[in-house]
Regions:
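GST-like domain detector, emphasizing the conserved glutathione-binding G-site
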Residues: 1-133
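A general structural signal for well-ordered secondary-structure junctions
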Residues: 25, 50, 79, 104, ...
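Long hydrophobic alpha-helical segments typical of transmembrane helices together
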Residues: 189-227
């Protein structure tokens, strides 16, 4: 049986959503986060040596990493609906956005989380201004400009077509969803990035997205500081 090892409030929501789009048979095994650290519980180490989510098991096969899982599931269970024909411009866009989400943009969101924790950390009075000063320089000199450049690029892309790879919904849109939902925490999308806001409205209206929330549970993105 195909099993999604589903960590609450995590990227694994996308995998449940993809499986709903595919109409595949699967089961969900839920894991709660550690209440003190916010990290995945030790039980996930029994599934994969890194103990991270998302991860799936399919018979005797174990697949981790969002992009790898999506590629595996599309290869095994799709019937040509969620991946463009190879060699086309849409396929090249598909490959790009499938990896951009967890490569370029996820690293920025992780840095935002770390900087936010530094800015809000409980520190001795003499250390707090030093830590905040360093965090401010990283945010202003690197993080915020790069986040804006990426959001501008995504907005421009969705200004040319409804979905990231053209006029057809693909698994790359599922992969990109977490990045844009994370961006929604940072900034007011409807006024600053209307195409991104429209993208979120479109995915949230999909029956498979709603079914994934019903089965996997709603999730919240916390710790990603707003500008």
């Amino acid at each position: 049986m195909l099993t999604v090892h589903h960590l609450e409030n995590s990227r694994s929501h996308r995998i449940v959503w993809l499986l709903e789009e595919l109409g595949a048979q699967y089961e969900i095994k839920r894991y709660g986060r550690d209440k003190e650290t916010g990290l995945a519980p030790p039980e996930m180490l029994e599934v994969h040596p890194l103990g991270k989510a998302p991860v799936i098991t399919d018979g005797d096969k174990t697949v981790a990493e969002s992009g790898a899982i999506i590629e595996y599931l599309v290869y095994e269970y799709d019937e040509g609906r969620l991946k463009p024909e190879e060699g086309t411009a849409e396929w090249r866009a598909y490959i790009y956005w499938l990896h951009h989400a967890e490569g370029t943009f996820a690293s920025l969101m992780l840095l935002s989380l770390v900087i936010g924790r530094i800015e809000n950390a409980s520190l001795p009075f003499f250390a707090k201004p030093i830590a905040k000063g360093i965090a401010s320089k990283v945010r202003g000199g690197y993080l915020d400009p790069n986040v804006k450049r990426n959001l501008d690029f995504m907005e421009w892309t969705l200004g040319k077509s409804k979905w990231f790879c053209g006029d057809r919904f693909t698994a790359a849109d599922i992969q990109m969803s977490f990045a844009i939902e994370a961006a929604e925490v940072r900034t007011e999308l409807s006024s600053n990035y209307p195409n991104l806001a429209g993208f979120l409205d479109a995915i949230r209206a999909r029956p498979a997205y709603k079914a994934a929330l019903d089965k996997g549970g709603h999730y919240e993105l916390t710790g990603i500081n707003k500008n």
